[in-house]
């Protein structure tokens, strides 16, 4: 009996998301401190002289930008904390099931299907301005089920290796190579 294959899927906890959330947070706090410096007439930032800005309209607009950036960064940190899009793919030939799980904002999305419904493992590679490298299950009478994460393209060798391993495990052909 073959051991089940459990593939973790990386969601929003990627380095690029952490960097964007950090930069937006720093920028938002900077704008808020600039606005506060303008209002109170004291420099709260070590660079520049934001206390010299006129409160209306410059300090007020800086405060509005700061509030917007802090709200956006709060959303980004919440998405990272929840790990939206993360989950796992579990292939169990012993139980004849495939379980796909992904985290959403408010719930865990999970569905199970029998291994017999899989016609093939599909490798999709599209290069160009918006590259796409995706591994999917082709099902009988239904749409393809994507297995790989959204975002940065996976290395071609890793995609082919993973697709071939999965096709061998499920005893189905590998398409698109």
From Swiss-Prot:
Residue ranges that the Swiss-Prot or TrEMBL entry lists as coiled coil: none
Entry's localization field: Cellular thylakoid membrane
Membrane topology type: Multi-pass membrane protein
Keywords recorded for this protein, A-Z: Membrane, Photosynthesis, Thylakoid, Transmembrane, Transmembrane helix
GO biological processes: photosynthesis
Membrane-spanning segments: 20-40, 60-80
Keyword presence, Thylakoid: yes
InterPro entries for the chain: PSI_Ycf4_assembly
GO cellular component, one term: plasma membrane-derived thylakoid membrane
Its biological purpose: Seems to be required for the assembly of the photosystem I complex.
The name this protein goes by in its record: Photosystem I assembly protein Ycf4
């Amino acid at each position: 009996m073959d051991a089940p294959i459990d593939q973790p899927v990386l969601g929003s906890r990627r380095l690029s998301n952490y960097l964007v959330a950090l930069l937006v947070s720093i920028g938002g706090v900077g704008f808020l401190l600039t606005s506060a410096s303008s209002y109170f007439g004291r420099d709260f930032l070590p660079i520049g002289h934001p206390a010299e800005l006129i409160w209306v309209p410059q300090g007020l607009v800086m405060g509005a930008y700061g509030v917007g950036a802090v709200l956006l960064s709060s959303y980004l940190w919440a998405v990272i904390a929840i790990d939206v899009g993360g989950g796992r793919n579990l292939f169990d030939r012993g139980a004849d099931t495939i379980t796909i799980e992904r985290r959403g904002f408010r719930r865990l999305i999970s569905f199970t299907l029998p291994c017999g419904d899989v016609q093939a493992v599909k490798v999709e590679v599209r290069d160009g301005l918006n590259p796409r490298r995706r591994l999917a299950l082709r099902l009988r009478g239904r749409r393809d089920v994507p297995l790989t994460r959204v975002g940065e393209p996976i290395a071609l060798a890793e995609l082919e290796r993973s697709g071939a391993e999965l096709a061998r495990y499920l005893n189905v052909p590998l398409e698109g190579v």
